């Protein structure tokens, strides 16, 4: 196509996560280009934290990922043996995912497999979106005098298949997910600022025999004088990955200049893990790199002091880089575009004013800064020599203390967005103390009333750019006519001030923009489904079939009571408003109609024709 709504550069995790979201909307013309001639086959990143797994649930492939992958259940720590400092000794083990921090595991997966899952999702989507391989962005310009396909992008054939031809595409929005050397970032004047650790590291995926006892656990190994190793087992029971600390570099030197090889890496690993050894049978993939921590000062094309809406964005390594040791790179990259995706959908479908897009850089830049700071600290601790107190066992090693402190951060669940018009003030936070405004909606077990299915409430949220309102009924409420839940549902469905009435385009399903669900405190056999208000039993789709899956009750079978687990007020109940990217925007009493109306009036706009903006 010569004109598109969104052009994405790069088919790494960030680019594919964005393309997958946009692929669900047939009326949004999306193009994704990649300079490589095809998808990657092996290597690259592998760690997926619990928050990213929650996102995968929204794409519908979390269960598949859980089945296929290695689960990181605990981390073992090895340090120099005080009796023989040339040898290492296990000094502790830590549970890797804290209890009830997430229902999801921390897993390790081949990045190429992850790409396949996104590509399959896109191929089966309403738009049947597929990448254009072999093309890279070489230049772009923005015409601020028009609102129609403002960005002109020059693409060049990077593989030679098309005789190095160029082509021009005009786009409403461009997103650079094209890595640390991003052409998109350079085109909008963005620069990565940061520092290098002047330290060469190697990474290898290997098939090997070893007498090291913890080879099927994640391990952090610190030797007295030879450096550090990080061991990550991989799916399938045999292959494992080793990150190996190699040579110190001069300030003006790159790791590539050292001409280090896989044999250097294997030799270094054997020196570090003495008295154990590894006998490598096959190196499946390897790479040498130097650690750097860097970040851009903005994630869009709007310079400081400019007052306009952005047209070009960067995400992932294009705007922040860090060491692989914290296992965050791939996760934060996808979380960048999970934040951006629904905002682009809202603007392109006329649901929200384009100013919504300003929030992307603001929200994600803050998180990227925090990531780089934490990674800096972690890298220093990992490379620091052990103290005497740590070696003789009188003090818990700093690396273990820091690891425990970081658990929420490394799980991806520590993100808390600052107050803005997308997050209401916390006046009613006490009604749901465990669902903090600005943080991700923390799922908990429930039972679906229509079929008595035990499940997680958060799993109803799909990557479909819809808002959710979860209404939690008070103690005596069984949704008989006149109850608080009935009153709320009736108001949402019929009142002219209701955001459902105001912002659902004519001719679309009543839950096309805002998806309303309810949770009751009784057991499922005590809840009269037939008495539910019609908004909880809507007729949707082409054939107008009834949706039976919007009513839930607490799980009395022992998996946990959502009211107790998330500090929800049993007497009064409450409603929780959740953004399309699963972050809590508002907590309100069940009769907080005016506040609910005012909140959505500040975010959404009336556009019954669904006209492009």
List PLM regions with ranges:
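Active-site-adjacent segment of FAD-dependent monooxygenases/related oxidoreductases
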Residues: 41-128, 132, 143-145, 232, ...
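Core beta-strand elements of the Rossmann-like FAD/NAD(P) dinucleotide-binding domain
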Residues: 2-4, 161-173, 177, 308
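Conserved FAD-binding catalytic core of PHBH/FMO-like flavoproteins
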Residues: 67, 120, 173-291
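C-terminal helical "tail/cap" subdomain of flavin- and related membrane-associated enzymes
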Residues: 301-305, 345-506, 522-524, 572-574, ...
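Conserved mid-domain beta->alpha element of the FAD-binding
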Residues: 11-20, 118, 176, 283, ...
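N-terminal Rossmann-like FAD-binding beta1-loop-alpha1 element of flavoenzymes
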Residues: 2-33, 37
